[in-house]
């Protein structure tokens, strides 16, 4: 299907200037979320470069990575803020599809690394009551994720301790067996030493 592109009302330099003003970090939705979390006592890192996709907000203590997404740029389905421009539609469809694909890949990669990924959409923060309610839900999600992380760490720690005990028991059985064999069949010390090397 061929799309009809309408002429841009701005000159190329004006359009370039407008596009350059669009921020990739420290956006209004991000700042709202950060203020809300900070007011509730959460401490976090911003734009963590060591993680895939540089999540907007990272809470290492809770194992949570938060993506604060603009509805337009990340293609929030069913959202009025995500309406596509009527000009150059093919370009915008492809761009937003690539953004959504990148978001999915980043989320999968972070989850594979053991992080809980929470996405907060721009439209969820519109309006004072709605925004506060979403930030409160976000705080609850973070606490739940932290509890899951602590539980998983405790399980890993206990399984490592159990594996360590099993190894010690195996070494004890092996030493007892060697002692029994040495009692039944005396082997000179130098030969035993050479066989272990």
Regions found by a protein language model. Give the residues of each.
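Nucleic-acid endo/exonuclease domains
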Residues: 2-119, 124-197
